[in-house]
Structure formats: C-alpha cells, structure tokens
C-alpha cells in the first residue's frame, strides 16, 4: 500500500469521525452541558437569594429581640414604680395608724392618770380624815402628834 493512499484513507476516516461526532454526538453533549450550566446558575441564584433572605430574617430577629428587651425593661420599670408606690402607700398608712394608736394611747394614759389622781385624792382625803380622827381621839402631845404624822406619811 501506498503511503499516500493510507494518509488519504485515514484523513477520510478522520473527517467521517469528525462529521459523525459533530452531527450525532456533539449536539446532545452540548445540550446536557448547557442544561447542567443552567441548573448550576439557578442553584447559585437560589443560594444567593437564600443568603439574602437569611440576612433579612436575622435583621428581623435582631429588631424583634431589641423590641422585646425594650418592652421587658419597660415592664420591669413599671413594676418597680408600682412596687415603690405600694411601699410608699403602706408607709403612709403605717404612719397614720401609728399616729392614731399613739393618740389613743395618749388619751388612755391621760384618762388613767386622771383616774389615779382622783383615786389618790380620795385616798389622801380618807387618810387625812382618819388621821384627824385619831388626833382628836387622843390627847395631843408632841410625841403622839409626831408618831401619828409619821404613820400618816408612811401610809401616803
């Protein structure tokens, strides 16, 4: 065989192979590659969209948490203010009740002192009358007089 014919035959076979690959095999491969590229592009776009949505959700969570903390602090502050009001009201009520009880006790003490004075006056007057009776029943001499006065003083 001649080398030219071999080269020519191989060239024809190679050209036929190129034509078969270009017409029968290449278009489906290109189609599959393009579909795969499109799926990858869609996946990347979806991932980007997911990242954006995640960032937005995180921002919303931060805002919600901030609002919740502010509301919680506000509620706590209101509770402290209410507790302070209740304490102040209880203090005022306790002071009022203490003053009322002190006034009642003072009135009771004054009444008891007055009763004691009256009782003491009655007792002293009875003792004075008894002492005078004893003095009048006995002879009045200095020693007897002194003894009776000492007894009277001891009873008082």
From Swiss-Prot:
Q: Which family does it belong to?
A: Belongs to the ATPase B chain family.
UniProt-recorded Gene Ontology molecular function terms: proton-transporting ATP synthase activity, rotational mechanism; proton-transporting ATPase activity, rotational mechanism
Name under which the protein is recorded: ATP synthase subunit b
Supply the gene name: atpF
Its membrane topology is listed as: Single-pass membrane protein
Task: Describe, as the record does, how this protein assembles with itself and its partners.
Answer: F-type ATPases have 2 components, F(1) - the catalytic core - and F(0) - the membrane proton channel. F(1) has five subunits: alpha(3), beta(3), gamma(1), delta(1), epsilon(1). F(0) has three main subunits: a(1), b(2) and c(10-14). The alpha and beta chains form an alternating ring which encloses part of the gamma chain. F(1) is attached to F(0) by a central stalk formed by the gamma and epsilon chains, while a peripheral stalk is formed by the delta and b chains.
Matching Pfam families: ATP-synt_B
| Protein function | F(1)F(0) ATP synthase produces ATP from ADP in the presence of a proton or sodium gradient. F-type ATPases consist of two structural domains, F(1) containing the extramembraneous catalytic core and F(0) containing the membrane proton channel, linked together by a central stalk and a peripheral stalk. During catalysis, ATP synthesis in the catalytic domain of F(1) is coupled via a rotary mechanism of the central stalk subunits to proton translocation. Component of the F(0) channel, it forms part of the peripheral stalk, linking F(1) to F(0).
Q: Which organism is it from?
A: Xylella fastidiosa (strain 9a5c)
One GO cellular component, as annotated: plasma membrane
């Amino acid at each position: 065989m001649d080398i030219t014919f071999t080269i020519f035959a191989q060239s024809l076979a190679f050209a036929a192979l190129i034509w078969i690959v270009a017409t029968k095999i290449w278009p489906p491969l290109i189609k599959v590659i393009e579909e795969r590229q499109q799926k990858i592009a869609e996946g990347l776009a979806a991932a980007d969209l997911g990242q954006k949505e995640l960032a937005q959700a995180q921002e919303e969570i931060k805002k919600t948490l901030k609002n919740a903390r502010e509301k919680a602090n506000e509620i706590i502050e209101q509770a402290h203010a209410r507790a302070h009001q209740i304490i102040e009201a209880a203090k005022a009520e306790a002071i009022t009740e203490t003053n009322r009880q002190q006034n009642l006790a003072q009135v009771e003490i004054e009444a008891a002192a007055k009763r004691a004075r009256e009782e003491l006056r009655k007792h002293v007057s009875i003792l004075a009358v008894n002492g005078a009776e004893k003095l009048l029943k006995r002879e009045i001499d200095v020693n007897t007089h002194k003894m009776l006065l000492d007894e009277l003083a001891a009873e008082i």
